[in-house]
């Protein structure tokens, strides 16, 4: 591991949250570099104040532990199984996982560990492909695999996908909230009353906000939209990840992901 997430000062035995780096970068289809995401997010989180005026909480008081990175090998399926087992142990011990990717495929491990009723994902892409370029464990299949576990998926900010993906998104177990509608979106009863997994793919943001990601897509969300969505879902979530940050910008994407992770913890701890 390169560094510890700033403010993650708790020991594992007393922690309420566990940061886990998952630097998988196996199926990136345009700009690689997601392997640097965990290191970059940790580094860029160092600029933020401990105190959160929205909740009145200090990050260092919220019992966050940093497990370090779980490094992948060439066996992606085996890696996801190992990561799932680790996250399951954290959940069983009462700690909320905070996964930093890595490509979006790592969400598959998180969802399998958390066994949610609802998968809420901020993403530019539908990620509903059964496989991509012959790979069934591609970053473009994250929501498809989430629906093998969850009863419902809500994709905030999606604006692109294949024809087959849009057809799949038309079924009743998928809700797509267009970027222009996200500022007015509120978590439905399924999120408020069930087990929810929250995933934030940084490419949900407009490229002007977060250019350091594998597959940019214009006309995306403002950083404030993402912040408000994360805070709205956090009290109802059992696990969180932020994914697809790479090293191909001046830090905008990593800084955004770090801020959103912190916002999740503040709101989950105080309102959850």
Segments and roles (model prediction):
Residues 2-272:
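Conserved alpha-helical scaffold segments that buttress catalytic/binding sites
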